[in-house]
Amino acid sequence: MKKTLLTLLFGCVVTAQAQDIIVMEPSYPPFEMTEEKGEIIGFDVDIANAICKEMNANCTFHSQPFDSLIQSLKQKQFDAAISGMGITEPRKKQVLFSEPYFPSSAAFIAKKDTDFAKVKTIGVQNGTTYQHYLAKEKKEYNVKSYASYQNAILDVQNGRIDAIFGDVPVLAEMARKHEGLDFVGEKINNPNYFGDGLGIATHLKNQVLVDQFNAALKTIKENGEYQKIYDKWMGGK
Protein backbone atom coordinates (compact mmCIF):
# COMPACT_ATOMS: atom_id res chain seq x y z
CA MET A 1 0.00 0.00 0.00
CA LYS A 2 1.41 3.39 -0.99
CA LYS A 3 1.93 5.61 2.04
CA THR A 4 1.22 9.34 1.90
CA LEU A 5 4.05 11.58 3.04
CA LEU A 6 1.98 14.07 5.02
CA THR A 7 4.96 16.00 6.36
CA LEU A 8 5.70 16.99 2.78
CA LEU A 9 2.12 17.52 1.71
CA PHE A 10 1.04 19.67 4.62
CA GLY A 11 4.36 21.27 5.51
CA CYS A 12 4.41 23.42 2.38
CA VAL A 13 2.09 25.10 -0.12
CA VAL A 14 -0.01 22.39 -1.76
CA THR A 15 -0.40 22.76 -5.50
CA ALA A 16 -2.42 19.58 -6.02
CA GLN A 17 -4.88 17.66 -3.91
CA ALA A 18 -3.25 15.82 -1.02
CA GLN A 19 -4.02 12.13 -0.63
CA ASP A 20 -5.04 10.98 2.86
CA ILE A 21 -5.53 7.32 3.77
CA ILE A 22 -8.04 7.01 6.60
CA VAL A 23 -8.71 3.71 8.37
CA MET A 24 -11.83 2.59 10.28
CA GLU A 25 -13.70 -0.49 11.45
CA PRO A 26 -16.84 -0.41 9.25
CA SER A 27 -19.30 -2.42 11.33
CA TYR A 28 -20.21 0.34 13.76
CA PRO A 29 -23.38 2.04 12.48
CA PRO A 30 -24.29 4.85 12.36
CA PHE A 31 -20.63 5.93 12.56
CA GLU A 32 -19.37 3.60 9.83
CA MET A 33 -20.77 0.63 7.96
CA THR A 34 -20.39 -1.15 4.61
CA GLU A 35 -23.30 -0.96 2.20
CA GLU A 36 -24.31 -3.68 -0.27
CA LYS A 37 -21.94 -2.48 -3.01
CA GLY A 38 -18.99 -2.55 -0.60
CA GLU A 39 -18.73 1.21 -0.07
CA ILE A 40 -18.03 2.42 3.47
CA ILE A 41 -20.63 4.98 4.58
CA GLY A 42 -21.74 6.62 7.82
CA PHE A 43 -21.44 9.65 10.08
CA ASP A 44 -17.66 9.37 10.43
CA VAL A 45 -17.24 9.02 6.66
CA ASP A 46 -19.30 12.14 5.94
CA ILE A 47 -17.50 14.12 8.66
CA ALA A 48 -14.11 13.02 7.33
CA ASN A 49 -15.07 13.87 3.75
CA ALA A 50 -16.30 17.32 4.81
CA ILE A 51 -13.06 17.93 6.70
CA CYS A 52 -10.95 16.70 3.78
CA LYS A 53 -12.87 18.97 1.40
CA GLU A 54 -11.99 21.97 3.55
CA MET A 55 -8.35 20.82 3.53
CA ASN A 56 -8.37 20.33 -0.26
CA ALA A 57 -7.43 16.70 0.37
CA ASN A 58 -8.71 13.57 -1.36
CA CYS A 59 -9.45 11.02 1.37
CA THR A 60 -9.75 7.28 0.83
CA PHE A 61 -11.09 4.87 3.43
CA HIS A 62 -9.79 1.45 4.40
CA SER A 63 -11.23 -1.09 6.84
CA GLN A 64 -9.40 -2.78 9.70
CA PRO A 65 -10.36 -4.36 13.06
CA PHE A 66 -10.84 -1.75 15.76
CA ASP A 67 -8.33 -3.27 18.16
CA SER A 68 -5.50 -2.86 15.61
CA LEU A 69 -6.19 0.76 14.57
CA ILE A 70 -3.84 2.41 17.06
CA GLN A 71 -1.00 0.01 16.31
CA SER A 72 -1.39 0.70 12.59
CA LEU A 73 -1.12 4.44 13.21
CA LYS A 74 1.96 3.95 15.39
CA GLN A 75 3.55 2.00 12.54
CA LYS A 76 2.53 4.74 10.05
CA GLN A 77 0.56 2.32 7.90
CA PHE A 78 -2.23 4.91 7.55
CA ASP A 79 -2.53 8.66 7.92
CA ALA A 80 -5.46 8.81 10.33
CA ALA A 81 -8.23 6.80 11.99
CA ILE A 82 -11.81 7.94 12.49
CA SER A 83 -13.85 5.11 13.97
CA GLY A 84 -15.91 6.24 16.94
CA MET A 85 -12.70 6.34 18.99
CA GLY A 86 -12.92 7.97 22.42
CA ILE A 87 -10.21 10.43 23.44
CA THR A 88 -8.79 8.85 26.61
CA GLU A 89 -5.58 9.39 28.56
CA PRO A 90 -4.13 5.92 27.79
CA ARG A 91 -4.76 6.40 24.06
CA LYS A 92 -3.29 9.92 24.11
CA LYS A 93 0.02 8.34 25.11
CA GLN A 94 0.01 6.34 21.86
CA VAL A 95 -1.62 8.58 19.25
CA LEU A 96 -2.42 12.24 18.68
CA PHE A 97 -6.09 13.29 18.60
CA SER A 98 -8.01 16.08 16.97
CA GLU A 99 -10.48 18.15 18.95
CA PRO A 100 -13.64 16.11 19.74
CA TYR A 101 -16.10 15.84 16.87
CA PHE A 102 -18.78 13.99 18.89
CA PRO A 103 -19.61 13.52 22.60
CA SER A 104 -19.23 10.05 24.11
CA SER A 105 -21.59 8.18 26.44
CA ALA A 106 -22.42 4.53 27.10
CA ALA A 107 -25.50 2.39 27.70
CA PHE A 108 -26.92 -1.14 27.56
CA ILE A 109 -29.45 -2.72 25.21
CA ALA A 110 -31.21 -6.04 25.61
CA LYS A 111 -34.44 -7.76 24.64
CA LYS A 112 -37.44 -5.59 25.44
CA ASP A 113 -38.81 -6.01 28.96
CA THR A 114 -35.48 -7.40 30.22
CA ASP A 115 -35.07 -6.92 33.97
CA PHE A 116 -31.64 -5.28 34.20
CA ALA A 117 -31.22 -6.59 37.74
CA LYS A 118 -31.12 -10.11 36.29
CA VAL A 119 -28.50 -9.35 33.62
CA LYS A 120 -25.40 -11.53 34.09
CA THR A 121 -23.59 -11.79 30.72
CA ILE A 122 -22.78 -8.69 28.66
CA GLY A 123 -21.39 -8.44 25.13
CA VAL A 124 -18.93 -5.73 24.14
CA GLN A 125 -16.63 -4.92 21.22
CA ASN A 126 -13.02 -5.99 21.66
CA GLY A 127 -10.40 -3.29 22.18
CA THR A 128 -12.87 -0.56 23.15
CA THR A 129 -13.09 1.67 26.21
CA TYR A 130 -16.41 -0.06 26.92
CA GLN A 131 -14.63 -3.39 27.30
CA HIS A 132 -12.08 -1.78 29.62
CA TYR A 133 -14.83 -0.18 31.72
CA LEU A 134 -16.65 -3.49 32.24
CA ALA A 135 -13.42 -5.27 33.17
CA LYS A 136 -12.49 -2.66 35.78
CA GLU A 137 -15.81 -1.37 37.11
CA LYS A 138 -18.37 -4.14 36.54
CA LYS A 139 -16.61 -7.29 37.69
CA GLU A 140 -19.92 -8.79 38.80
CA TYR A 141 -20.79 -9.46 35.13
CA ASN A 142 -19.53 -12.11 32.75
CA VAL A 143 -18.14 -10.26 29.73
CA LYS A 144 -18.02 -11.70 26.22
CA SER A 145 -15.94 -9.79 23.66
CA TYR A 146 -16.63 -9.57 19.92
CA ALA A 147 -14.62 -8.37 16.92
CA SER A 148 -17.77 -6.49 15.85
CA TYR A 149 -21.25 -6.04 17.28
CA GLN A 150 -22.98 -8.07 14.56
CA ASN A 151 -22.40 -11.40 16.33
CA ALA A 152 -23.29 -9.82 19.67
CA ILE A 153 -26.70 -8.89 18.27
CA LEU A 154 -27.31 -12.49 17.23
CA ASP A 155 -26.25 -13.73 20.64
CA VAL A 156 -28.50 -11.37 22.59
CA GLN A 157 -31.44 -12.22 20.31
CA ASN A 158 -30.86 -15.94 20.89
CA GLY A 159 -30.33 -15.66 24.64
CA ARG A 160 -26.61 -16.49 24.67
CA ILE A 161 -25.87 -13.13 26.32
CA ASP A 162 -28.21 -10.89 28.31
CA ALA A 163 -27.22 -7.43 27.09
CA ILE A 164 -24.83 -5.42 24.92
CA PHE A 165 -22.77 -2.48 26.22
CA GLY A 166 -21.52 0.31 23.99
CA ASP A 167 -21.85 3.80 22.56
CA VAL A 168 -25.35 5.31 22.76
CA PRO A 169 -25.82 6.20 19.05
CA VAL A 170 -24.54 2.78 17.97
CA LEU A 171 -26.93 0.98 20.31
CA ALA A 172 -29.80 3.23 19.21
CA GLU A 173 -29.14 2.20 15.61
CA MET A 174 -29.16 -1.47 16.65
CA ALA A 175 -32.49 -1.03 18.41
CA ARG A 176 -33.92 0.76 15.38
CA LYS A 177 -32.88 -1.98 12.96
CA HIS A 178 -33.59 -5.00 15.15
CA GLU A 179 -37.12 -5.23 16.46
CA GLY A 180 -37.29 -6.50 20.00
CA LEU A 181 -34.17 -4.73 21.31
CA ASP A 182 -34.33 -1.70 23.60
CA PHE A 183 -32.28 0.25 26.14
CA VAL A 184 -32.10 -1.13 29.68
CA GLY A 185 -30.50 0.28 32.80
CA GLU A 186 -29.01 3.76 32.99
CA LYS A 187 -26.75 5.64 30.61
CA ILE A 188 -23.18 6.01 31.84
CA ASN A 189 -20.99 9.10 31.44
CA ASN A 190 -17.51 8.49 32.81
CA PRO A 191 -14.74 10.60 31.24
CA ASN A 192 -12.10 8.51 33.03
CA TYR A 193 -13.01 5.66 30.66
CA PHE A 194 -14.96 7.15 27.77
CA GLY A 195 -12.86 10.30 27.44
CA ASP A 196 -13.85 13.77 26.41
CA GLY A 197 -15.59 12.78 23.19
CA LEU A 198 -14.65 11.07 19.95
CA GLY A 199 -11.63 12.24 17.99
CA ILE A 200 -9.65 11.64 14.81
CA ALA A 201 -6.39 9.86 15.65
CA THR A 202 -2.99 10.21 13.95
CA HIS A 203 0.65 9.38 14.66
CA LEU A 204 2.01 11.16 17.75
CA LYS A 205 4.37 13.29 15.66
CA ASN A 206 1.74 14.38 13.14
CA GLN A 207 0.79 17.70 14.77
CA VAL A 208 0.62 19.46 11.41
CA LEU A 209 -2.14 17.13 10.21
CA VAL A 210 -4.06 17.44 13.49
CA ASP A 211 -3.95 21.23 13.19
CA GLN A 212 -5.39 20.88 9.68
CA PHE A 213 -8.15 18.60 10.99
CA ASN A 214 -9.02 20.99 13.83
CA ALA A 215 -9.21 24.03 11.56
CA ALA A 216 -11.44 22.19 9.09
CA LEU A 217 -13.66 20.80 11.88
CA LYS A 218 -14.13 24.31 13.24
CA THR A 219 -15.13 25.53 9.78
CA ILE A 220 -17.76 22.84 9.13
CA LYS A 221 -19.28 23.47 12.57
CA GLU A 222 -19.51 27.18 11.82
CA ASN A 223 -20.88 26.90 8.27
CA GLY A 224 -23.63 24.41 9.12
CA GLU A 225 -22.20 21.39 7.30
CA TYR A 226 -21.59 19.50 10.56
CA GLN A 227 -25.22 19.99 11.62
CA LYS A 228 -26.47 18.67 8.28
CA ILE A 229 -24.39 15.52 8.69
CA TYR A 230 -25.49 15.13 12.31
CA ASP A 231 -29.17 15.42 11.39
CA LYS A 232 -28.71 12.88 8.58
CA TRP A 233 -27.18 10.16 10.76
CA MET A 234 -28.07 11.03 14.36
CA GLY A 235 -31.54 12.55 14.09
CA GLY A 236 -33.66 11.24 16.95
CA LYS A 237 -30.77 9.51 18.73
Curated annotation (Swiss-Prot):
InterPro entries per UniProt: Iontro_rcpt_C (IPR001320), SBP_3_CS (IPR018313), Solute-binding_3/MltF_N (IPR001638)
Keywords: Amino-acid transport, Periplasm, Signal, Transport
Compartment(s) of residence: Periplasm
GO molecular function: ligand-gated monoatomic ion channel activity
GO cellular component terms, A-Z: membrane; periplasmic space
Main localization category: periplasm
Pfam families reported in the protein's UniProt record: SBP_bac_3
PROSITE patterns for this protein: SBP_BACTERIAL_3
GO BP annotations listed: amino acid transport
Record keyword Signal present: yes
Gene3D superfamilies: Periplasmic binding protein-like II
Signal peptide: 1-18
Function of the molecule: Binds arginine; part of the arginine periplasmic transport system.
Homology family: Belongs to the bacterial solute-binding protein 3 family.
Protein name, as recorded: Arginine-binding periplasmic protein
Native species: Mannheimia haemolytica (Pasteurella haemolytica)
